From Swiss-Prot:
SUPFAM superfamilies according to UniProt: beta-beta-alpha zinc fingers
Function: Through its association with the EHMT1-EHMT2/G9A and PRC2/EED-EZH2 histone methyltransferase complexes may function in gene silencing, regulating repressive post-translational methylation of histone tails at promoters of target genes.
Domain of life: Eukaryota
Protein name: Zinc finger protein 518A
Amino acid sequence: MPFEQTQLFCDEKQTILKKIDTRNEIPDTIKSIPIPKISEAGFHYEPKNVNICLPKINIPNEILMKHEVEKYRKLFQSKPQTARKSVSVRTVSCAKGCAQRCESERAEDEAGKMCAKILNFTCSKCQDRTQYSPNDLQKHFEMWHHGELPSFPCEMCSFSASDFQIFKQHRKTHRNTFVKCDICNSERSYTLLDLTKHFTSKHCVNGNFQCEECRFFTQDVGTFVQHIHRHKEVHYKCGKCHHLCFTKGELQKHLRVHSGTLPFTCHYCSYGAIHKDQLVRHVITLHKEHLYAKEKLERDQYDKRVAKTTTGLKLILKRYKIGPTKTFWKRKTIASGNDESIGKNAQAFNIVSKTQTKSEDQSQEQLNEEKGGRQHCEDGDKPIESGSEKATVLSTGQCNKADEGASAPSSVLSAVQGPTVLLVRNNKITIPANYSAKFMGFKMVDGRQHIVIKLLPANKQILPSPALQPNTEKESTANLPPQAMDNTGFATGLTAMNDTDFVKAAPLSCSSPELPRKVISEKETAFISEKNNMLQMVDDSKSVTSLPTPSESVTSVRLTTKVEARDNVDLWENPSTQSHPDLIGTSINSPDKVNLTIRPNAYSCGDMHNYCINYVNSELPAESSNCFEFSNQGSLPFHNYSKVNNKRRRFSRGAVCENLQRESSNKTVTQQSTSDSDTTSPLRKESSNSDSLLASISPLSGTLKIKTEIEEPCDLEETQNFNEQSLFTNENQNLLNMTEEPKWDDIPCAGSPMMPRITSVFSLQSEQASEFLPPEVNQLLQDTLKPRSDIKEDSNNIPSKNLPLDCDQTLKKSKEEVIKSSKDFQMQDIISVPSASVGVNVPANDLNLKCNGQEKQALSVLQDVRDPGVTTKIPSIITLLKTQSDAIITQQLVKDKLRTTTQHSGPVYVQNPLLTSEQKNPVFVQTPKGFIIPLHVANKPGLHVFSGRPVPLVNTQSVPAALLVNKKPGVVLTVNNGKPEGVPTVKTENVHSYGTVTKEPCRTPFLKAEHNRYCLTPGLCSSIGSCVNMKTCSENTLPLKGSYIIKTSVSSSVKAVPFANVLPEQQGPNVNVLDAVKQQNESLPKASLYTLMPDGKQAVFFKCMMPNNTKLLKPRLVQNSTYQRIQPKRPAGAPQKILLKIFNPVLSMSAVNNLSVGNSASSFQKEIVPSKPTVHGEQKVPQSSRDALPVSVQDLMPANEAVLSSTAACPGSSEEPVHISERSETRVSRSKANCTIERNFNKRKTCKNKFAKIKTRISQDSETAFVSRNRSCKRKYIDNYQEPPRKKSATHRKCKERANAEDVQETFGFSRPRLPKDSGRTLRLFPFNSEQLVKCPRRNQPVVVLNHPDADAPEVERVMKTITKFNGRVLKVSLSKATINALLKPVSITSETTYSDFSKRHKMLKPVNSVKERFVLKLTLKKTSKNNYQIVKTTSEDVLKSKFNCWFCGRVFDNQDVWAGHGQRHLVEATKDWNMLE
């Protein structure tokens, strides 16, 4: 007795059917029974009557409850991967092939002892080399070798045991035996126990073992290992693309992709397809009107032949009691028709239902046959040669002859040549004279054993088609529920089999309305159930689907199976498409009328039913007919519709409708028909010679196959499987007209613009960082680009003539407004953005809809414009875009429909760029308060920063500040009152853009340029601390009030990571972001510390980075009659480097006095120049753009200390020019006074590493005392200063390094006392990892401070050590009181008490007691036993995983649940003090 139901028609070793003439071997108990000779090619039958004796199989009669049925079902179907012993047909050639395979496997057994393998055993009695699991072998012996014990031999030695537990104990003695992992393919050997741990830790993701070569996954390590060995078997490899196929049929199907020809063409248009099912979908979707006309003609012909048929279709309704009050109806499957279907898992199992009572033996036992000529997934390598093979569907039952005769004229009959009754009695099957039988095996249905026998006709006979009565159309239409008629859109007889002859599929407009889930009303069902409470045949006079009036009854009316469309929320973008669907899914209306009673309440209880539908004789356009077969087992509840998994699919513009996936009905419906040997339909003759369309839904995988079969045998293998499972909603759910009412309920709303977008956290996107930005910003960031845009089409978008939009009209519209785009909103219009690399790309909006809890992503497909008229306009369009005025560009920014939040409500003036004589150089102009900087490149590759009150406000427009947002991808910095709110970096594919800044600066100079000279002049922005290398290019720039110029080397080498975004036409300066990983090892304060702000405001993630300079360049002073400038030596052709950075001014003060700890070989040269009325007295020249960061604010801009120290208290500062010469003498005197203290301090070495050698040169114009003091201090610098700390000791020494840096700074007297915690600061913002997608949080998003410079307490350092130890697994840290007190304790130490209190202060910072923290770790646990768990590590790095990026901190997650929870914690922190945020 087989104990587990296997995939009988998919298992390679069990059901491979060879085409050659062989004698079927039935093993064991039925070997002595004569077996008919079957030739599948000719089907010549030799014996007339064959009796097949089958062993009696007893199944308990008590299996009536659902849980018992499920228990037996699981018993028989627990492991489909393992071959089972069953009474099945085995060809000799198959046995030989298996023997050869086993020989090759035996040759590998020597090496197999050193590799992982699952415990499989063969039967020592049968000796047929069939592999069994230990439980299966035990069951096999109990069934076939009763009274004997199985043998479990050890593969590592000669030990053998009859009990598996003893065998397991023996295997423990081989624990030291080393084996290898087949997945890793490494030379490392494991013990058996270690190998199990290795599989669990390395190759298990969330408790699932997933195959890297296919989509198979399981939770059982043994099944997983066995599956891996399957990939090592003989494969069929494509010679062109090295694609591997497991069967020859799959290979032949794959080879058609490389043929380049379109063997299937549409009869109504020029459409061509590679596969037949694609052509079927095309015809159904676009040429319904032709099918309607053809249907009308065929219907008239059928009505004339109705009276000639004498046989009818019978239904056997079986009533089961599951529970006290629930009544289920099971429809026995009867199939008939032209069967040449091929494909994976596309089978119709015919089941013999064995009844328990003698009265039911004759009437209820039925044989459901496999259709003749069906090939299975393993046998797909050879086609069926016979194009007209017919499978016979036989029904048994005791029929009321009188009722049958009375109802014969009014019944729909399906005449089938062959036996009318197939009796199964006493385990003997009587085969008719004109049929041969093939035993296929057993099948478990509802806990009962069913015999599957395939009947093959002896000769090629044409089966007649059914005939219909003229009055059935009206009756069947009248019996339709009102819902069904309203939603289906057919005038008469929507689902009547006599009315429709072709496949009706969804037109895919808007959404998919659902077909009626039942054909009869509740009253009718109740009426039928009362009259059929006993298991009996339903008379034709009392039809299931007809009203309870015997005179008006029709035996088989119509079939409306609710087959929902795969894309049930997709929209047509083609306006010419039919706006309302006439029929959704795949509603097959065949001439054979079928009585269908579907009780959804029965399915809601999960009862397993077997329904099979075989549709015949539905003709499709141009002499082609359809044969639809629907079969399934194990129905699913109707209300599980929300669990439909929508998968991503790509569609090309030319053949979108080809790949539309249709979900099959998960219910199988029965059509029982009795054959009539006297009548023959001409339609059947036509269908045997013409092309036919076959759509079959597999019972095992629920896949839909639509095939067009022609006479070429090779074309029979082109069935395309869509592994989608159709789940059905509840019966009570109303059928909505989704045409007018699209499903936008599941689409997340945009959220309030005044708050951070919470909905973005839970977007199921992992494509790019731009997806985490709000749609308004994302559209703005991409509007001004000219990239290679991909056309994003909706998955059911059918190509239309209007798809390549008129680019001229679109561009004219784009000048005036920016079309708002949103993935999370509804579909907008299509805008076209020309690119220099491609002709014209029309980016449709990336529609992102949530379909029943699952978000569906429309994949972008590159679209080539085929319209020559549009292509010729491309150069002029590009020129137009490049030459359009900056006023129009500004209008696009202003007129955009954005509702962004800014903290200042006053008007902000947008200054347009100035046209300069030198077009290739960027312009930097002073930016006073109230001006925004539109860094736009228009017809010039330079970067333009325009602002300043002295500029004539001719093109300046005053707009609300809430409407302004930066429009370019790259670094977007929003500065409100001197505080950076967020700097997100958008990464797009193959697109480069320029980093831009949008700010409302303070009154201090932001960027200053000079007149009449071309020099590299990086200015210092006191409000945000950005150091930018820039180049003045105009002699007519704004008048300057005086500026300090820090000369930097253009040719200095800076290790930097360029922006991912750069405009294609940009050829000017390159924006570079320093490598975070590199600087993390070279930064002064590098630990990520966690601080708490007492004022309740949000903290910020900061990386205090110190740049590294590699080349020294001496300054060149140029005297001028008016003022003094510095010009660098610029090599010919050297590109300009522009470095946009945010830094901590307090940190920079200590860094400049420490002379850049992060620079291993840096040397600063101070040039003290005599003060002049218009010239600043002190010039400081770092050697590269990175050296401009640590410039002390007091050295350059002492008047702006208030702004730098606390921007919250002083949002604006003086507009007067900075004169450092006024403070130079004071600074010299302070250096004299503190030089002795510095010497004494240098004697106390706090770190072991040496600082870099620093050369300090003082100009001759400075005082000699200051020079001598500095020279004497230089030796102490060399001895005392460290090199950048190493990676291992970086965290340990951070506190000491900062203590040194701050004390040296305070010793010289350059620094002020530390500011209290509650004062706001402008700190440096830098990502953790330069490779992460989200560099910085989006604007208006809360940030968390980790390494605040004032929070270097050892308590926090201990926390960070723990975080580093767990390598990113820490989700939450609960700080103890000691740590919180250390963070909140204000430090205010003056320069007078620095030295005296240094040792005491340093000791105070050391922890007295151990700090206890609580860490919530992210660990994936796998349950090993009842209460034991073990940590499951991630899979190998080469396995492709889904990534989920946190839009707050940029952290990357591979688990969606963990990512969502992580975002929730950010949101809780963001909204904790919501009323306090301003």
